[in-house]
Amino acid sequence: MLAVIAPAATAYSLIGTSSRSHTVTAQVSAQAPVAVQAPFALTGARMRTRTPAVQMSEPAGGKKKVFVLGGDGFCGWPTALHLSNLGHDVVIIDDLSRRKIDVELGASSLTPISTPEVRVATWKEQTGKDVKYVYMDLQNEYDRFLKLINDEKPNTMVHFAEQRAAPYSMKNGATKRYTIENNMGATHNALCAIVESGLDIHLVHLGTMGVYGYGNSGGEIPEGYIDVMLPGGREKNILHPAYPGSIYHSTK
């Protein structure tokens, strides 16, 4: 095993702009060098530090229309409210699968959670801002989803529409199949619909570091592609290897 030392990262901002999408800013703070255990040698300067936080800025040049896929979930709902509060036009798309799984498992939230209709009505009452809710199964209603895209013409989609529990994904054969079919099918349909619509839509997909495994690298996980030295001295540029520990992580 070779110990590879990644250079320290200095504080900087990553700013991406588009004529159809407002600025996205990510802050990265200074970090100490990181030791990474690897069965091969990493070369070049392609080892990048992970970005700990990405934040959507205030609307520039008017509000944007944002689809929040899976917007009824624990992360999707506050994200939808945050974007609405910033002045964006938000459309929540959700099939309420999280609630259905809770019923299946005989579980419930520590605090009562109202229906999506009540939630958006309360948000309107409290803030005067409209959030639209559409009940839709993204995995199985592709044509309807494509029509919604063509009708609403969103600038951005934030994608939370996936079965989100690693333990549930390993519970039995049915939950394994559901996790794979739902998570991969929903993501594939979202990407296909964007392409088929012909619209300039940005997709933000929420993942997990568990794709690369927990506690295996001994340090920061390099982002994206890395240069490696293969046995025999041959160099190759590869995507950082995945090491998922569950069906859920393998779909992310």
Where are these regions (language model features)?
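N-terminal chloroplast transit peptides
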Residues: 1-44
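Generic extreme N-terminus detector
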Residues: 4-6, 51, 60
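Short acidic, low-complexity intrinsically disordered linear motifs used
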Residues: 9-12, 51-55
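Glycine-centered signal
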Residues: 23, 27, 51-54, 248
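Intrinsically disordered, low-complexity terminal segments enriched in Ser/Thr
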Residues: 47-49
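N-terminal Rossmann-like NAD(P)+-binding domain of SDR-like oxidoreductases, especially those catalyzing
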Residues: 57-252
